[in-house]
Regions:
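Positively charged, polyanion-binding regions of nucleic-acid-associated proteins
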Residues: 2-29
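Long, charge-rich, low-complexity intrinsically disordered regions
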Residues: 2-3, 91-98
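Charge-rich, solvent-exposed alpha-helical interaction surfaces
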Residues: 9, 13, 40, 53, ...
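Short glycine-rich, basic-tinged beta-strand/loop micro-motifs
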Residues: 24-44, 98-106
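Charge-enriched amphipathic alpha-helical scaffolds
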Residues: 28, 38-67
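Charged low-complexity interaction tracts in eukaryotic proteins
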Residues: 60-94
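A cross-family detector of function-defining hotspots
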Residues: 112, 118-153
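Intrinsically disordered, low-complexity regulatory segments enriched in Ser/Thr/Pro
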Residues: 147-177
Length: 177
């Protein structure tokens, strides 16, 4: 279960990166704190135990992403995904991927929360929208569980544009906003 969650998260982050920066067939490095990896594996591993867990990846995962290399400094883990992983993600990103549409919308100055909400609503019924006042963000939007997008999308109106960050629910809870 944990490896499939990790694979999905790695692919989702790479899709987001490619939506923002464009595609290049190159190796990618993604960083995770130990706490996030423990959430993905539903574990309470130490740094050493997590490093041991990440030595061998399932064959179906490496068939998609290539031979991943994992290192760590302290409790910060680095995943190096080879260029074939970048290529796999690029080839499997749909033209109407939600994250791609969101990034393109937020590139535009003058984008409103109403437009962002409409984008969410075009992708699913029952979108949850909360006003939040935690000093970091103004709004939290998320899809219902049935949609299969587990992330909490947090938005901040910076005046001339809106920024966002997305979190897995467990990571969002760790911030204790």
């Amino acid at each position: 279960m944990g490896y499939s969650k990790l694979e999905r998260n790695l692919i989702d982050l790479m899709k987001e990166e490619q939506a923002k920066l464009g595609y290049r067939k190159e190796a990618v490095r993604l960083y995770y704190p130990l706490s996030s990896l423990n959430h993905l594996f539903e574990a309470e591993d130490s740094v050493d135990a997590m490093q041991e867990r990440l030595i061998h990846f399932p064959e179906d995962m490496t068939a998609k992403l290539g031979m991943l290399a994992v290192t760590h400094k302290g409790d910060r883990f680095c995943f190096r995904i080879p260029e074939e992983g970048s290529e796999y993600v690029h080839e499997h990103m749909g033209a109407n991927e939600f994250i791609k549409e969101l990034v393109e919308m937020l590139w535009q100055h003058g984008t409103t929360m109403e437009q962002i909400r409409a984008l969410f609503d075009r992708h699913a019924d029952g979108v949850i929208c909360e006003n939040i006042d935690n000093g970091e963000f103004d709004y939290l939007l998320r899809f219902p569980e049935s949609v299969g997008d587990p992330y909490y999308y947090c938005f901040k109106n910076e005046g001339c544009h809106i920024i966002y960050h997305r979190f897995l629910p467990e990571d969002y809870a760790d911030f204790d906003f």
